[in-house]
UniProtKB/Swiss-Prot annotation:
Protein name according to UniProt: Anhydro-N-acetylmuramic acid kinase
UniProt-annotated binding residues for ATP: G10, T11, S12, M13, D14, G15, I16, D17
Pathway(s) of this molecule: Amino-sugar metabolism; 1,6-anhydro-N-acetylmuramate degradation; Cell wall biogenesis; peptidoglycan recycling
Described purpose of this protein according to its UniProt entry: Catalyzes the specific phosphorylation of 1,6-anhydro-N-acetylmuramic acid (anhMurNAc) with the simultaneous cleavage of the 1,6-anhydro ring, generating MurNAc-6-P. Is required for the utilization of anhMurNAc either imported from the medium or derived from its own cell wall murein, and thus plays a role in cell wall recycling.
Entry-linked CDD domains: ASKHA_NBD_ANMK
Gene responsible for this protein: anmK
Length: 366
């Protein structure tokens, strides 16, 4: 038995998820979510929305996020009375602030200094996972299908897993076939940004506000024409693309805020449903994870759009929908530490197998 910690803050930026994972059983021992401090959250919002930050401010933010990730580790271990020396390594995703693979020079950047995390926790850290995939010819995202494949390794039927974070991504798993996956489009990011702008809330709990509005179908149809939705897979996208500025250029003065929220939820539901239906009726089970798995109104919309397909939370399998991505980065850290390459060729379009991440080691004294 080996213990690894995974750290994840997704494009929703709703906090740092920390998961203590037992391998090789993939058993989640404990998980917590630590909210970002107000200053860090404000600076992240400014950076991702394209507001001006100095280079010095970005460098400081990299260190500050590293400190907050380290504090999440300390809180996690304190709650269950586990000593840092018992942990083999931490897998830290960091906080994505930009990700674009559309040009001749693809790039991705996750903040959260690995040296800071390792020094403050006394635990070896693996970070900067996505850059290796980009260099290897891949899209750098999504990685979730790798871990979904582990969970459904004994699958006897075709299933789909959709992770609904800020960006939604899909995994298709079938017996005796290569696992496939890609980014679908906006998951929670537009709904979160819109409710924050109008109500000051971080997210629309259970989709209640969206349920009070009416879908603006001309707006929905216009949004669905965005070129990203019509790209062939593999494909990936960042939250900075599907931003409020992307939305607001399509809005009219007579649209009500609640109706816009209803339309944004419909956009997420329709793009997910279309992705599933394009699998030619093979899929009979759809499992949801990420924050969107708790959005009751979104799940109801998906069930309506996907007749004959059981739409479930991955919690029905005894797996936490909130900590699945953090668990994945704990697992990825173990692959890196043990020099085990991963195969993303059918997911990100990478040219071959690779060992992901950069290692920030700590010399343990016993």
């Amino acid at each position: 038995m080996s213990l690894y910690i995974g750290l994840m803050s997704g494009t929703s930026m709703d906090g740092i998820d920390a998961a203590l994972l037992e391998l090789p059983s993939n058993h989640l021992i404990h998980g917590i979510t630590k909210q970002y401090s107000d200053d860090v959250r404000r600076n992240l919002d400014d950076l991702i929305m394209g507001n001006h930050l100095t280079l010095a401010s970005i460098c400081q933010l990299n260190t500050l996020i590293g400190r907050e990730f380290a504090e999440a580790v300390r809180q996690l271990l304190s709650e269950i009375k586990v000593h840092p020396k018992e942990i083999q390594a931490i897998g830290s995703h960091g906080q994505t602030v930009c990700h674009d693979t559309s040009g001749n020079i693809p790039y991705t950047l996750q903040l959260g200094c690995g040296h800071t995390i390792s020094s403050l926790t006394g635990i070896t850290v693996v970070a900067d996972f996505r850059t290796r995939d980009l260099v290897n010819g891949g899209q750098g995202a999504p990685f979730a299908p790798l871990y979904h494949q582990q969970i459904f390794s004994k699958v006897n039927e075709s299933v789909a897993v959709v992770n609904i974070g800020g960006i939604a991504n899909v995994t298709f798993i079938a017996k005796n076939q290569m696992t496939r996956g890609w980014d679908i489009g906006p998951g929670n990011c537009l709904m979160d940004a819109w409710i924050y702008k109008n109500k000051g809330a971080l997210f629309d709990k259970s989709g209640v506000w969206a349920s009070q509005g009416e879908v603006i179908y001309p707006l929905l149809e216009y949004l669905l024409q965005d070129p990203f939705f019509h790209l062939d897979s593999p494909k990936s996208i960042g939250k900075e693309y599907f931003s409020l500025s992307w939305l607001q250029k399509h809005l009219k003065p007579d649209y009500t805020p609640a109706d816009i929220q209803a339309t944004l939820l419909a956009l997420t539901a329709h793009t997910i449903a279309e992705t599933i239906l394009n699998e030619s009726g093979e899929i009979k089970q759809l499992y949801l994870c990420g924050g969107g798995a708790h959005n009751t109104h979104l799940k109801e919309n998906l069930a309506r759009l996907l007749p004959g397909i059981a739409v479930k939370s991955i919690a029905e399998l005894g797996i936490s929908p909130d900590y699945l991505e953090a668990m994945m980065f704990a697992w990825l850290a173990a692959q890196t530490i043990n020099q085990i390459p991963v195969n993303l060729t059918s997911i990100t379009g990478a040219k071959g197998i690779a060992i992901l991440g950069a290692v920030y080691p700590i010399i343990k004294s016993y």
